[in-house]
Structures are given as C-alpha cells and as structure tokens.
Amino acid sequence: MSVVRPKKVFQTPIDPGVSLRRKKDFYIWAATIGFAQLWRDIKAFKWYRPLQMADLASHYFYIPLGRLDPRILSSAPNDRMLIKTIPHEMSQDYDETGILGCPGREVVNAGSNNYGGFTRFEYGSASVIKLALRNLPFNPAPEELNTLVEREMADYMEADACATAISGYGANLLAFLTVAETAKLSDRQCIFLLDEESHSSMFVGAFLNKEAKFHRFKHNDIADLEYKLRTMKETSPNALVCVAIEGMYSLAGNVAPIPAILALRKVFNFCLLVDEAHSFMAIGCKGRGSFEWWQARGYECPLSEVDIMTATLSKSVGCTGGLVMANKIYASNLQHQARLQREEGDECLSTIVLFRALTLIRKPLFIERRMKTLEEKARYVAERLDEAGCLLLSPPGSPIICFPVGTVQQASNFVAECLKKGFAVACGVPPATPIWSCRVRVCIFATTSWGDILALVNTLIAVSCKLRIDGVQSMKFDTDSLPKVSIKEDIVSDEGNAADLALQEYVEQLAAKYPAEDCRAIAPLNVAQAREVFEYGVQSFEMYGIGASSVRWFYGTFDVFIRLEQRLAGLYPSLISHSGKCRAMLGSDANVMAVSLLSAVAGPMYAKDVLNLVLVPQNAPCYVKKGATLDKVQPSTRVTLYEDLRDLEVEGTKLQKHRYYHVTLYLETVDEDGSILDLSNRIKDILLTLKNAPSLTGLRLILDDSRGLGKIGPRHLGFLDQMESQHGVSFFSTALGPQLAAITTVVVFGSWFHSLNHQGGYVISSEAFTEAHTVSSKSFVFSTPPMIVQAAMSEKTLELLAGGSGLV
C-alpha cells in the first residue's frame, strides 16, 4: 500500500538544513570579521583583555557584526523614515564620529514593530500629547490618571484588573511574580512550564522566583505540552502549574494554538499566562491579540480564560511601557504586588504614555478598521511570497512575516541588500535563534501604502533570488495583483475627534491640580529651565513621535540616543581620567537594567583560576539582589549578600581555598537618609575584612548614583560631580590608591526616574566594559529602548545642568 504524502499546505513549516558549503562560508566570514577587529585594535595600539568569558565573542564578533551596516534613524519610526547613510570606513565607530554630517535618505520601514501604524498620530491625538508635555509633570504621572488607564485598559481587555509597568520586560517580571506569590499564599509548589521560544523576559521572570520550579516544552507542540502536564500531575499533584506562552512569536510570526491549549486547561486546570507583546494592537478584530485571532476563525476562545496576560505599549502602540491584566484570584494578587512595588519606590509610566494609551483605546471603531487593513496587507504579502516559493514560518495574515535564510552571514547580507534598495527589514540571529536557523523578519504596517507593499514584495523576492535562498523563484508582481478594494478609515473620524477633544479637556483639568512647573516635579531645574526642557520635548515629539517601536540590536538606533550617550560618556572627567575613553548605554526600565547588569557581572571570569566574588549589601534594592542571584550557582562565581562587615569575615576565610579572586562590588552613592558614600574608607574596610589582598586580581566597582544625579554636586550632576569638586579629576586614584586603581573597573549606574523624574536608566563605564555589556545585557538586547522624547529631554537637562556646554 502506497503512502500518500501530505501537501505542503498541511505541513508544519520548519527551518531547512544548512549545507556544509554555507557553514564553511560562514566560518570564514566570521573569522574575517574577527581578524578585521584585531587589525583595528593593532592599528589603534590596543590589546584587548577580556574580563569575563563572554567578552571575547562580543568584541571580535557581535559588536563588529552589529556595526557592518548601522542604521541611524533621524525621524519617527513610521512606514517611511529617514536614516543616516554611514560610510563603511567609519561604520565601526559610528557612535563616536560626526554622524550628524552624514547624508540621510528615506526608506520604507518594514523592520520595526509598529504593526498598527500608531506612531502616526491620528486625529487630535498629537495635540493631546503636546498639551500634556507642556502642562503636566512628565513623571511621576498623576495617580488618578494611572488609575483611570488601568481601569479602562482592564475593561477593554475584558479583565478583572490591570497594572502598568515601565516596560514589556518589566510587565513579564511582575506577571511571573504574581503567579509565584499566588502559589505561596495557597501553600502550593509553583511550577512554570514555558514554550521554549518564549521571550527572554519570560525566562528571566521564571528564574527570579527561586522557590518555583521551571520546565520547557517544545514550541507550539501540544503533544509535548500534554505529556509534561500529565507527568507533573502524577509527580506533583498539588502544585500550581503555570503554562506560559506568547500570543504571537516574534521570530516566527506564528500564533499560539490557543484552542488546543484551552482544551488541555479543562483537563489539567493549570494557570495560563499569555504574553501578547507582539499581538496586542496587531492581531484580532479589536487588537486584543491571539484569542481574538482564533475567535475570528470560528473558535470559542473567551479572553476570560486567561489568568494573566501581559502586553506592551512599546511595539505596535509606539510608546514605552507594559501592561499586566489578570482575572479571578490572580487579579487581587496582581494589584497587591503592583502596590508593593510602588511603595518601594519603583518607577511609573510617564504622563504622555498614559495619555497615548487613552487616545487609542477610546477609539474602538478606528482600531477595528486598522486591524482589518493590517491583516489585508499582511495576507497579501504572505500569499505573494508563498507563490514565489518562499518558505514562510508565519501564517497568512500575521503582521510578522518570517522565513529562514540559514546562517548569520546570509541574514546580514539579506538585510544589507534590502537596505540598498530602500527597504529596512530586520533579522533574527543568535542568541535569539539557533546558529543555523537565522531568519529574515519582515514587519507589515497598516499605514504602509499599497504601492510600497507591492515594491516590498518584489524586493524580497529579488534579494532572495540574488542570495539563492532555497525554493524562491524569480517573480515580479504588478498592480493587477493588488486587492481591488481597500478599507477606508474616514467613516470613524467623528469617534476619533470626539475622543481626543474630551482628553484635551481632561489634560486641562489635571493641569489645574498638577501643574508641570511644580517645584518637586522639575527639580533640580528652575522654572525657566524646566520650560525649555518641556519645549524641547515637544519639538522632539513632533520630529520622532514617542517611542522607538523596536530593539536597537535588531533594528537600529536613533541619533537622539547617540547624543545622550555621548553626553553621558563625557559627563565625568574623573571617570575618563581613570578609565580612558568611556561609553554609555540607555535602557527603558532602570529596574530591569539593574537585573541585567548584576546578572552579567556575576558571570564567570575569563581566567579560569580566578573566582568572581560578587558582594551586594542586604539593604540594596530588590532588583539588584535578584539580578546578582539570577543565574545558577557556579564554582567560579560566588555571590554574597551581606548585612555588615562581620559577614565578610566568613567570606574571607573561604577565600583561602582560592589562589586568585576578583571582587565585583555594588555600592549606592547616596543612602536613603541622604548620607554620601565614603568610597575610600568603604573599600579599605571591605578588603581588610577579606584578608586576602595579595590574591586580588581586580575590582569592579558598580556605583549606583540613582539618588545622586540631580541631587548632589555643585552642578547637581551626582556623586562624581561632588567628588571632583573636592578631590579633582584624580579622585579614583586618590580614593583607591594607585595600585588598586590600576586594576579597578568603574561602572556608574543610575535611574532617570529617581534623579530627574524621567523614565528608564543608564550605564557609564569604560569603552571595553560598555561595549561588552551591550551584548551581555539581556535588557539591552531584548528590550525596547527608552522613549525618544524622554532621551531628548534628559539630554537637554544634562546640558542645562552642565552649564549649557556642548558635547564634551
């Protein structure tokens, strides 16, 4: 009896294998990149000395790879945007050279996550944002505004409760914490069962809850999920099992099998956590994600079946921030955990982000039209690419269209070729994908014109043929292939205008109670300086919108970010005197940055015989301690949370077993009571307690200046500003002594929220450390950067505090 093979349409798309020749080409290409970086080091008389195991790959591959074809964006991330063309001879140092003088050109944007096209502000929504920027505190937002957004968002998503978070990354951390605490309250073991292709933030969220167990199941594999659920029911019958999935997966574009998962839920009664980061305002008739996607296909998938749902405002909505929705018992626990975080002084969403959320969800008819338009355009692109023989990993109608290209080299070449033709697309490469499963990632926007959609399809096919992507045949489509009828949005203009007018009136009502120029909100600026910063924010908004809509590593960066990072890098002469050339990096969420920073520096050292001793005070912020203890215990690393110096005496005794050790020390520059760190004596006391100084190979000093910047120093520029005024630019040599200073790496970390009432965080350190950390930091690699508006306002504030000086 012959076997009937299923047709292609019934097969699950998988990444094809990579030929031996292409693997060989990749290794030669990777070696070329590494040797080119080595030659640049030699010409600059530099000898790179890696401090940790991961640093070598960062310096010789990931950093130069990311700078082969850098994208510097100088307009809003709309469907068409302006980018700077960086000459190849200066691309490896693009953030240190005169990028503003480089020529710019307009390209079609198919690389960011602006699926709904909401970076183009509809009707009167831009007026609402500008009014809020000028008349209300930037951050913290009025509490009643935050409460209103949480209530209306819960209603829109048909949830019992909603809590806001500073980032989508932070939203997942809060969601997993809520599940773990719910299990603890019911005296049950918590077990997280995650889809293996879930977001990095979901894995981090699971890892941070140390009392919980953690397992993976194969991507979208219902049989594997059922097997693991049945096993857990037999081995841990009383456990609270949480199945965590994404609604739509960003590096495949496929949607989770929600109907099948809900069927399993009826049998095993597990908690269901769904991350709708890429599907919120991207799929579903009302933009509510994967459940609506399946409802439109005839399945009964009520949103009430979700126990916890996370979403982000950083992607399709075009801002920065996250949302956590919850039902039943998880709703009250979510509100409790969110309240605890606020009481501990956590950041909160800025006023303009909250108003942008309101301007959107109060226009349900407008959203419905956008979602229909988006699916129509996404389906057209997918069908044409499929017709040309492209192996799509995403289903028709998904706004993320992914197809495999094999190696990192092929992915990099594909992106570069598209950019030459005027189209910006993205790619998925390690660590986000397996080494031989790199993908091209094309994002469809509802606002992209049909002419650009057609040109995009033809470009993708042409580049695929040029690079010999398996299965793709040469084809060119014309306007006759386009749908005859497109959806118009003008019929919902009455709804949009009325909603925005009501919100403008609400801004004015709030401004009477919470004026923007309140002394506490604008400190350390005076009223005139604050007005200048507000107007600079308005100008930035008019040019860039609010948010970046995508991750820098996979998409590109904005000239605004580079200017702020350059200013931060030159802010402290004492740090430059000690470290040499400095660099800075930005993040949208200071807490998440702290987790990533401490997790990265707690890794093993490059020298195998050196113990990395990480010392963190017990009174350090919660997220600092969680980051330091995030990863599994390794024999080459020891993390110690100490109350006082007596705890370190025990640690000093243990050090006798090790020939060499390196100390990573976290210190806050200003305590809660306002006392300023005596760095010299603190270091001396700690090293004296360890009693093994001759074996010390190095010191990494992490100075948390969150309570310093904007508060202390003659220019209100923080701890180092204060120390430089007292000890000069040789402060570190004086405080540490020349011998210890020579082996010390200084890292300055801070929160814009606690210092300037802005949003997000920053890191400043030596060029070597900062470059390596742009790869080792999970928050930098996988999280959306800060709001462009906020970065511009922070840069202007630093300029004013520094006395109006230009870039150092």
UniProtKB/Swiss-Prot annotation:
Q: Tell me its cofactors.
A: pyridoxal 5'-phosphate
Q: Which domain of life is it from?
A: Eukaryota
Instruction: Name the enzyme's class.
Output: transferase
According to the UniProt entry, the coiled-coil residues are none
Gene Ontology annotations of biological process type:
biosynthetic process
Give the function comment from the record. Answer: Aminotransferase; part of the gene cluster that mediates the biosynthesis of the host-selective toxins (HSTs) AAL-toxins, sphinganine-analog mycotoxins responsible for Alternaria stem canker on tomato by the tomato pathotype. ALT1 also selectively transfers methyl groups at the first and the third cycle of chain elongation for AAL toxin.
Query: Could you tell me the keywords of this UniProt record?
Result: Transferase
Q: What is its EC number?
A: 2.3.1.-
Family the UniProt entry places it in? Belongs to the class-II pyridoxal-phosphate-dependent aminotransferase family. BioF subfamily.
Q: In which pathway does it act?
A: Mycotoxin biosynthesis
Tell me the organism.
Alternaria alternata
Quote additional remarks: Gene clusters encoding host-selective toxins (HSTs) are localized on conditionally dispensable chromosomes (CDCs), also called supernumerary chromosomes, where they are present in multiple copies. The CDCs are not essential for saprophytic growth but controls host-selective pathogenicity.
* GO MF terms held by the record: pyridoxal phosphate binding; transferase activity
Record flagged with keyword Transferase: yes
Protein name, per record: Aminotransferase ALT4
Question: Gene encoding this chain?
Answer: ALT4
